[in-house]
Amino acid sequence: MNDTPHVKLHGFNNLTKSLSFNMYDICYTKTPKEREAYISYIDDVYNAERLTNILKHVADIIGAHVLNIAKQDYVPQGASVTMLVSEGPVVEVPQAEAPLPEAVVLSLDKSHITVHTYPEYHPSDGISTFRADIDVVTCGEISPLKALDYLIQSFEADIMIIDYRVRGFTRDIHGYKLFIDHDITSIQNYIPEDIREKYDMIDVNIYQENIFHTKCKLRQFDLDNYLFGHTKDALSKQEVEETTAKLKREMDEIFYGKNMPSGF
């Protein structure tokens, strides 16, 4: 996506690039038993071990070296993984009482990949949702956008909210500041066409601040894909209409970020 010729830099590339990927899975559970089964299913499918494997693959895609991994499954539900990464290969630092070199500390502090999961449900409406928040923060030439396609395909979300920003600056050999080192007009530039065709998308970008924001909502709606433990054949015509309305309203509220009146 970047045809800009390489600029010779003075020293290390100090740009910090942050990709925030929030995905939502929505489901209708008819009974409390189905709801508990859905949450248990989500907890099993997106446990800390599987999330760790996803993040390891993200690190491979962006060319980062894993320094440390911390992971945890929570009770009653949810999981999180934090991975520290570096742009260069891992170098063994000799044991010494003196503080570590500053460059090593910066490498550890500023490049990381995290994921947290949040299953939840409506107290009485039958709607259950699952949210996963993934943050990929890199310092240097590594671009987290390279992993976006893989993340989208890993979660197959009903709704995605994606943010990307670039902070700091680096200098060329003449001292001229560079506040971004690649071409981008929209996060959609980095989403393959076959995926873009599946989603309705809205962009809110602030170009002068290097802030890019894209919301995505699945276009095709098949009720059977949102029912857990049964199919629409088990529902009456009225139940199909009411359940469809509930699910679409839930998706619209998440997509637009606001509560909506019944019948919207």
Swiss-Prot record:
Question: For this protein, what reaction is catalysed?
Answer: S-adenosyl-L-methionine + H(+) = S-adenosyl 3-(methylsulfanyl)propylamine + CO2
User: Gene3D superfamilies, from UniProt?
Assistant: S-adenosylmethionine decarboxylase
Marked site positions, Cleavage (non-hydrolytic) = K110, S111
Is S-adenosyl-L-methionine among the key words of this record? yes
Record-linked SUPFAM superfamilies = S-adenosylmethionine decarboxylase
- PTM (free text): Is synthesized initially as an inactive proenzyme. Formation of the active enzyme involves a self-maturation process in which the active site pyruvoyl group is generated from an internal serine residue via an autocatalytic post-translational modification. Two non-identical subunits are generated from the proenzyme in this reaction, and the pyruvate is formed at the N-terminus of the alpha chain, which is derived from the carboxyl end of the proenzyme.
Keywords (alphabetical) are: Autocatalytic cleavage, Decarboxylase, Lyase, Polyamine biosynthesis, Pyruvate, S-adenosyl-L-methionine, Schiff base, Spermidine biosynthesis, Zymogen
Query: What EC numbers are recorded for this enzyme?
Result: 4.1.1.50
Cofactor(s) the protein needs: pyruvate
Q: Which residues carry this modification: Pyruvic acid (Ser)?
A: S111
Q: How is the cofactor bound?
A: Binds 1 pyruvoyl group covalently per subunit.
Biological process (GO) annotations held by this record are: spermidine biosynthetic process
Which residues does the entry assign to the active site, renumbered to this chain?
S111 (schiff-base intermediate with substrate), H116 (proton acceptor), C139 (proton donor)
Q: List, alphabetically, the InterPro entries matched.
A: AdoMetDC_fam_prok, S-AdoMet_deCO2ase_bac, S-AdoMet_deCO2ase_core
Query: Which biological pathway?
Result: Amine and polyamine biosynthesis; S-adenosylmethioninamine biosynthesis; S-adenosylmethioninamine from S-adenosyl-L-methionine: step 1/1
Disulfide bond residue pairs = none
Q: Does the keyword Nucleotide-binding apply?
A: no
One GO cellular component term: cytosol
What quaternary arrangement does the UniProt entry report?
Answer: Heterooctamer of four alpha and four beta chains arranged as a tetramer of alpha/beta heterodimers.
> In UniProt terms, what function does this protein have?
Catalyzes the decarboxylation of S-adenosylmethionine to S-adenosylmethioninamine (dcAdoMet), the propylamine donor required for the synthesis of the polyamines spermine and spermidine from the diamine putrescine.
Q: Cross-referenced PANTHER family, in alphabetical order?
A: S-ADENOSYLMETHIONINE DECARBOXYLASE PROENZYME
HAMAP family associated with the record:
AdoMetDC_2
Instruction: Tell me the protein family, please.
Output: Belongs to the prokaryotic AdoMetDC family. Type 2 subfamily.
**How is this protein named in the record?**
S-adenosylmethionine decarboxylase proenzyme
Source organism of the structure: Geobacillus thermodenitrificans (strain NG80-2)
What gene is this protein a product of?
speD
